[in-house]
Amino acid sequence: MNRKLFMTGLLMLAMTMQAQTAKKFTLNLSDDGKAQMVCFLPENPSGRAIVGVPGGGYSMLSNTHEGYQASDWLNKQGIAYFVVNYRLPHGDRTIPVGDVEQGFRIVRDSAKVWNINPNDVGIMGFSAGGHLSSVISTMSPYEVRPNFSILFYPVISMDERVSHKWSCINFLGKEGYKDPKLIGQYSTQNAVRSHLTPPACIISANDDRLVPVVTNGIQYYSAMRNAGNECSLFIYPSGDHGFGFGTWFKYHDQLLQDLGNWLKSIPAPKEDAIRVACIGNSITDGFGIDMRAKYGYPAQLQGILGDGYWVKNFGVSARTMLNKGDFPYMNEMAWKDALAFKPDVVVIKLGTNDSKPENWQYGSEFRQDLEQMIKALRPDLAQPAKKGKKKAKAAAQPAGPKILLCTPIPAFKPSWNINDKVITDEIIPIQQEVAKQYGLQIIDLHALMLNDGDKVVDDGIHPNEKGAKKMAEIIAAAIK
């Protein structure tokens, strides 16, 4: 009887394990078949997916406990899992980067077939694979950048003095690892960008002597936190380096609980959500608001609009509409990302920094630069609507997003050399004329916030949390 019960238990366990993974298969990522992706699709998909990137110091792949062993647990959560067995750099760092990017392309291109939400695809890297994952998270184009990152005891710094020497040498090359410019470029704490770098979870052990957490994982966490991005840090008392999903790790169960809770805290946008891109300067970015990813105006706009919308912040501090300004917005990664986002609605709020004398000396070009942005977003508006044809135009399906053109909010103080008179007398009239010319909706934030000097921080320029809320309310009303 006991033997029967024992055998039944084993059978049930086997059935349970099998049920978690519905399908396993391998795909080639490179023409020579040396780069491959092992795919684990869950029985009951949640729509979420994770691309796994094993460690190994860029000299080998540790793809068992830092790869395949995670599949059962992830599939049990309904998460599709894809382990990328990337090619080693051998002096060419673009090889492993390209392999992981190709894995992301395949996952997102196959999303419908594999029951995946293409906007909910994360990356999970270990050690040197953590470094590679952080490179993908900070530097790769929007189309192949993850929606969230999980970094196990990651190599972050490429400075051999504070990191894993051989990871630095193998990734940058025997000469490259001595180049201060390359070291700085690929020490990925330097590449973190507000709003553009995805939320991250960093996992390490306090006694890791191979990849010191203070000069690696914590540096990435600090950069994320300082940028106002979502980030969590889990440091366990012991475990050294390389524990991964190994059951021998003393805190294995706690790790799974922590990771599971973190994953639940990262909301996934609906596939059919209306996409709203917030383009702008530091006022959009949320300068002066701690944790601006949560409390800046785009985040508050998301809260007002609800989960039927997907609002993304593409604000960059100090940027100008003017292409000859000191920091032109259209030179930024954020601008490329905003276009790649393929928004349904675009909120443009630029012009404040253009009012500075050093920038407004090129004010005669403000109109043409604003028109350039509008036409890039809406190619169908390359030719302004002619009188008498507005009704016919309105009946046609627009070849791009709805554009909301915001005037700058009032500059209550002349901080940062910003000139409110230039804003009111020169910039706003141009915006109004362009909006009328192209049939765009204009939101006059300057007029609507003229009496809100109590809703900005001490510099008199940037809205505080209350000011961001008012902006969000005004813009939400225009969107709805």
From Swiss-Prot:
The EC number(s) this enzyme carries: 3.1.1.72
EC class (word): hydrolase
Keywords: Carbohydrate metabolism, Hydrolase, Polysaccharide degradation, Signal, Xylan degradation
Residues in the signal sequence: 1-19
pH and activity: Optimum pH is 6.0 with glucose-pentaacetate as substrate. Active from pH 5.0 to 8.0.
Temperature dependence: Optimum temperature is 30 to 35 degrees Celsius with glucose-pentaacetate as substrate. Active from 20 to 50 degrees Celsius. Still exhibits 40 to 70% of the maximum activity after 20 hours of incubation at 50 degrees Celsius.
Family under the similarity heading: Belongs to the AB hydrolase superfamily.
Function: Involved in degradation of plant cell wall polysaccharides. Is an acetyl esterase with broad substrate specificity, releasing acetic acid from acetylated xylo-oligosaccharides and acetylated xylan as well as xylose-tetraacetate, 4-O-methylumbelliferyl acetate, glucose-pentaacetate, and cephalosporin C. Appears to have greater activity on oligosaccharides than on polymeric substrates. Is also able to release acetic acid from xylo-oligosaccharides with 4-O-methylglucuronic acid side groups proximally located to O-acetyl esters.
Protein name from the UniProt record: Acetylxylan esterase
Protein's gene: axeA1
